[in-house]
A protein has these predicted regions:
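Beta1/beta-strand and adjacent pyrophosphate-binding region of the FAD-binding site
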Residues: 2-15
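Conserved N-terminal/central alpha/beta ligand/cofactor-binding core
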Residues: 4, 21-22, 26-133
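Conserved beta-strand-loop-beta-strand element in the redox core of flavoprotein oxidoreductases
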Residues: 133-142
Length: 142
């Protein structure tokens, strides 16, 4: 099993999946190293991309964040479009300054699609491990 990675992402929630995907795209496997350069650690890989009790994507703040992530090549918005079961415009009667869209996603399908997408991502290894600490040597991660 490979143990040498340039980037190790701990956790497969929203931030972890985006970080792992972005790092895998940026660190193209051209350095001569064999194998992926990015690892995503999750105690249970079947829970990667699993949504909280509220499977909503959007709203004033989160909607803006998702749009910015999408503009940077992220996958959260794409996966939301694939798995949405209801769309709604929020604050429609209050004017354009506070109007926002929100999608309700199928929780199980969202996680399934996210896992499938990341599994196919070149340069990314998904590993079923726990990070119990970070080893440093002379002030650097070793």
């Amino acid at each position: 099993m490979q143990t040498d990675f340039d980037v190790i992402v701990i956790g497969g929630g929203h931030a972890g999946t985006e970080a792992a995907h972005a790092a895998a795209k940026i660190l193209a496997p051209t350095s001569g190293k064999a194998g992926p350069r990015v690892a995503l650690l999750s105690l249970n890989p079947d829970r990667i991309g699993f949504m909280s009790c509220n499977p909503a994507m959007g709203g004033l703040a989160k909607g803006q964040l998702i749009k910015e992530i999408d503009a940077l090549g992220g996958i959260m918005g794409i996966n939301t479009d694939k798995t949405a079961i209801q769309y709604r415009i929020l604050n429609a009667s209050k004017g354009p300054a506070v109007r926002s869209s929100r999608a309700q996603c199928d929780k199980a399908l969202y996680a399934q699609e996210m896992q499938a997408f990341l599994t196919k991502t070149e340069n990314l290894a998904i590993l079923p491990f726990e990070a119990a600490g970070i080893l440093t040597e002379n002030g650097k991660v070793s």
